[in-house]
Design a protein with these regions (language model features):
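Conserved cytosolic headpiece of P-type ATPases
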Residues: 1-739, 744-747, 760, 801, ...
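Short N-terminal signal/transit or membrane-insertion segments
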Residues: 146-148, 773, 805
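Membrane-helix interface motif
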Residues: 272-277, 767-782, 848-852
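A C-terminal functional module that forms or caps the active site or interfaces directly
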Residues: 815
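Helix-coil boundary and interhelical linker segments in multi-pass alpha-helical membrane proteins
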Residues: 698-706, 772-795
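Core segments of transmembrane alpha-helices
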Residues: 689-690, 754-766
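Generic alpha-helical transmembrane segments
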Residues: 717, 795-812
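Membrane-water interface at loop-to-transmembrane-helix junctions
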Residues: 742-760, 789-799
Length: 894
């Protein structure tokens, strides 16, 4: 059946539904079970085996596999040794690959959970009730309501259209919105079908309602939609890497190149040192190669990228628990350096619970009737509550108190046409027919805009001409209400006799109207917002209010919240239009409130802040907010009142539409970035210590650690504390710091120098432990015998492994604060303590069980353990001293 060639009644009949009542809940559930959810089929996922082997494409893993192959060759060649190294290396490679697969799976699960949290919703009529359901639960035959800002959730035949326009570029490539209607289409001569773009009585999945509203019946879902039919041609953009992840990838590649160069130098040094002796000496070649591999293993922080990704994912999950749903990982990093927050007023800074508290009219009944008739909110007689957009719900509630319910008004004055609200006119009009047959237009909107289109006024004595004196009085009443932080709406009407207007275009309707009255509503400030604004200010973040409300209302609320101190810091959209770009660039830092703004004003405000180098966040809920949200560094959509389009382009969605949530998210962003820096510094300083130790030992001529030892330390000893750092609470004063510069790299703030100093100290402790271990065994620090007989160095190697493992465990506690003393931290990280204990146990297991033979360790006693513990623990006072020196240096610079 081609629904666009059939009448609406025939389509309703074919789908076995009812245009007014919709499907029953039971029938909808049955159809959902029979035909499946309303979503496109997902691309088949790679098998676990394929993912597993994909992990081995890493250059580091390839190098380890080569080392394993050479060790195996050595075992076969000599008939002894080597095999244990092969087993350990392969075990580590397998574990690394398994962890990689698990981590990818966790990331996919997290993404799926986030997608579910921000899933699109649809308004549907079932059993005669208006309900909101997940778009994936829609079935053929559902009656849905569409309005400006909605993404069309399924293919549907339009039943009613009130000036509805739909943008279908996702299907047709044409960005100009198409005006929709409910009339039956007919084929042109010599044609057998109508192109998709000309089917004006249809709406298709993936298109966007940009104007007006409508009612439609679903005729296709999921893969049966037009979008589903071309699903193979649709490519969904994958989540890109964050700047931090890109930087880490570059760091890994740089380290890999450096390692190859250093390893080649070590190999070349061996040839120079041993000369012709090395040629044909497989053992010598092998030992030199293993030193090179050791350097490679030591230099590459194998778990760094995975750890950082997990830290980000954990942060995103934590943010969602605080009602901030992050849709793009880049937002996590950017939140930590946000400098300007451009916030909408209604619902974000205020509670979005409007209540009419004041009227200015000489005909209250006519005024409240007009307000209710000109609203799309409905009054639920059973629950005695209004449902719909908050402002309209307040007006409908006000009318119901006087006995005018929406159901009674709809039956006595049915709507026959309308000019929907849009942000440029700031008003909407409906045309109704009374029981006596008269056609009356009712208009509501911004007082100044409505008043400008009126020529008469309704008084207690009847309708008279609207004089300049009366206009001035109305504007004074409007200002009086606005000064009390009331949102003011005006009503007007126009009689059309018995004939309906030929056109419902706003230009035809909204002129020569009769002014009826004003209603003042209060939307209370959210109690937590004032403190959040103050906290943002202390954290170096500027709050800017951008609203469509009257400037007096905006100023009153902004002053109450501490956003501005007086009216001189506020301007209107009209005033902004008169300011040149150069002047605005100079004045923007003095402006805290923008009132009566248009969508293009928001884009200009964001662009100007960004040109000044300020990291800017922008909130929004309407479809017209999408351009400014996309332009901002952080686009923030509203989860409750936001349209699908706005949420779709946002980097972050506020599940509770609360400004305070933005500040919480910024704090969380700072905490996450701090913890990532701690992980990076911990892992890089540890790896640098290993490189220095192995390199110095190779120059002297002894082996301090084998590749398998370093792999164990990097993947077990280091990774557990690094992951535990992801749970570290925010340091005291984190929201008293200025935002970080987004251009700062990983090593900004002295991280690179810190890594060098800390790595050098750890390396010295490790080298010292080797000599101490040798002394415990042979009673001398002279290791000349080790150079000629590597077997004599087992005790020193065991001591070096134990000390390096333990010193890195202790060093993880130093990383709880990069500059502050850890003894001044008031919180405890139980996960870090847990990782410390677990790493300690695993280290003892490797040394004190039969595993020690595979690793080539010697038996050591209590004295060695005590000395290793003493050396390892010394890293804490040494780092405390270093931090104190650095704090003093920074203080002197300041």
């Amino acid at each position: 059946m081609k629904e666009y060639l059939s009448s609406a009644a025939d389509v309703i009949s074919a789908q076995k539904t009812d245009a007014e009542v919709g499907l029953s809940d039971a029938e909808a559930a049955s159809r959902l079970e029979a035909h499946g959810p309303n979503k496109l089929k997902e691309a088949p996922k790679e098998s676990i085996i394929k993912r597993f082997f994909a992990q081995m494409a890493d250059p580091m893993v390839i190098m380890l596999l080569v080392a394993a192959a050479i060790s195996a060759a050595e075992g076969i060649y000599t008939g002894e040794g080597g095999i244990a190294d092969v087993v350990i290396i392969l075990f580590v490679v397998v574990i690394n690959s398994v962890l990689g697969v698990v981590q990818e799976g966790k990331a996919e699960e997290a993404l799926a959970a986030l997608q579910e949290m921000s899933a699109a919703q649809s308004k549907v009529i079932r059993d005669g009730r208006l309900e909101t359901v997940a778009s994936t639960e829609l079935v053929v035959g559902d009656i849905i309501l569409l309005e400006a800002g909605d993404s069309v959730p399924a293919d549907c035949r339009i039943l009613e259209s009130a000036s509805m326009k739909v943008e279908e570029s996702a299907l047709t490539g044409e960005s100009v919105p198409v005006e929709k209607h409910a009339e039956t289409l007919s084929l042109a001569e010599d044609t057998d079908d109508i192109p998709l773009g000309d089917r004006k009585n249809m709406c298709y999945s993936g298109s966007i309602v940009v104007y007006g509203r409508g009612r439609a019946v679903v005729v296709a879902t999921g893969m049966d939609t037009e979008m589903g039919k071309i699903a193979d041609a649709i490519s969904q953009a994958e989540e890109g890497q964050t700047p931090l992840q890109i930087a880490l990838d570059k760091l890994s590649h740089t380290l890999t190149i450096l390692v190859v160069v250093i390893s080649l130098l070590v190999f070349a040094t061996g040839f120079i040192k041993h000369g012709a002796e090395m040629l044909g000496n497989f053992d010598l070649i092998l030992s030199t190669f293993m030193v090179a591999v050791s350097l490679a293993v030591a230099a590459i922080p194998e778990g760094l990228v995975a750890v950082v990704t997990i830290v980000l994912a954990m942060g995103v999950t934590r943010m969602s628990e605080r009602h901030a749903i992050v849709r793009r990982l880049t937002a996590v990093e950017t939140l930590g350096c946000t400098q300007v927050i451009c916030s909408d007023k209604t619902g974000t800074l205020t509670q979005n619970k409007m209540t009419v508290v004041r009227h200015e009219t000489e005909n209250l009944d006519a005024h409240v009737r007009t307000m209710a008739l000109c609203s799309d909110a409905t009054w639920d007689d059973a629950e005695q509550v209004a449902k719909g957009e908050p402002t309209e719900a307040a007006l409908v509630t006000d009318a119901a108190k006087l006995g005018y319910t929406t159901s009674d008004l709809a039956s006595s004055r049915p709507r026959i046409g309308e000019a929907p609200f849009d942000s440029s006119r700031k008003m909407m009009s409906v045309v109704v027919r009374t029981r006596s047959g008269k056609v009356v237009q009712h208009t509501k909107g911004a007082p100044d805009e409505v008043l400008a289109r009126c020529t008469k006024i309704m008084t207690s004595d009847g309708i008279i001409d609207l004089t300049d004196e009366a206009r001035s009085e109305i504007l004074a009443q409007n200002k009086s209400m606005a000064d009390q932080a009331l949102r003011v709406m005006a009503s007007a009407r126009r009689d059309w006799g018995t004939e309906a207007p030929q056109s419902y275009d706003p230009a035809n309707l909204e002129h020569d109207m009769v002014f009826v009255g004003l209603s003042g509503m209060i939307d209370p400030v959210r109690p937590e917002v004032k403190g959040a604004v103050a906290e943002a200010h202390e954290a170096g973040m500027r709050t800017v209010m951008i609203t469509g409300d009257h400037i007096d209302t905006a100023v009153a609320i902004a002053v109450e919240l501490g956003i501005i101190t007086d009216r001189s810091q506020a301007i209107t959209g009209a005033q902004l239009d008169k300011i040149s770009d150069e002047e605005f660039d100079q004045r923007i830092e003095t402006i805290g409130v923008y009132a009566r703004v248009q969508p293009e004003h928001k884009v200009r405000i964001v662009d100007t802040w960004r040109k000044k180098g300020m990291v800017t966040a922008m909130t929004g809920d309407g479809v017209n907010d999408a351009p400014s949200i996309k332009r901002a560094d952080i686009g923030i959509g509203m989860g409750i009142t936001g349209t699908d389009v706005t949420k779709g382009v946002a980097d972050m969605v506020l599940a509770d539409d609360n400004f305070a949530t933005i500040i919480s998210a910024c704090e969380e962003g700072r905490r996450i970035y701090d913890n990532i820096r701690k992980c990076i510094q911990f892992l890089l300083s540890s790896n640098l210590a290993e490189v220095i130790s192995v390199f110095i030992a190779s120059l002297v001529g002894f082996t301090i650690l084998q590749p398998t030892h370093l792999l164990w330390i990097n993947l077990i000893t280091d990774s557990l504390p690094a992951l535990a750092m992801a749970t570290e609470k925010a340091e005291p004063g984190i929201m008293k710091r200025k935002p970080r510069n987004p251009k700062d790299g990983i090593f900004a703030g002295g991280v690179g120098f810190d890594c060098l100093v800390q790595g050098s100290i750890i390396a010295l402790l490790t080298l010292a432990s080797y000599f101490i271990g040798h002394y415990f065994e042979y009673g001398t620090f002279d290791i000349s015998q080790v150079i000629t007989n590597p077997e004599a160095g087992v005790e020193g190697m065991t001591m070096a492994f134990l000390t390096l493992s333990m010193v890195e465990m202790f060093h993880s506690f130093n990383m709880r604060s990069l500059r502050g003393s850890i003894f001044k931290l008031t919180s405890q990280n139980i996960w870090l303590w847990g990782s410390f204990v677990m790493s300690l146990i695993l280290t003892f297991v490797v040394i004190e069980t039969p595993l020690s033979q595979a690793f080539g360790f010697a038996e050591i006693g209590f004295e060695e353990y005590a000395m290793a513990m003493l050396l390892a623990a010394s890293i804490i006072p040494l780092m405390e001293l270093y931090k104190a020196v650095m704090r003093s240096v920074q203080k002197n610079k300041a």
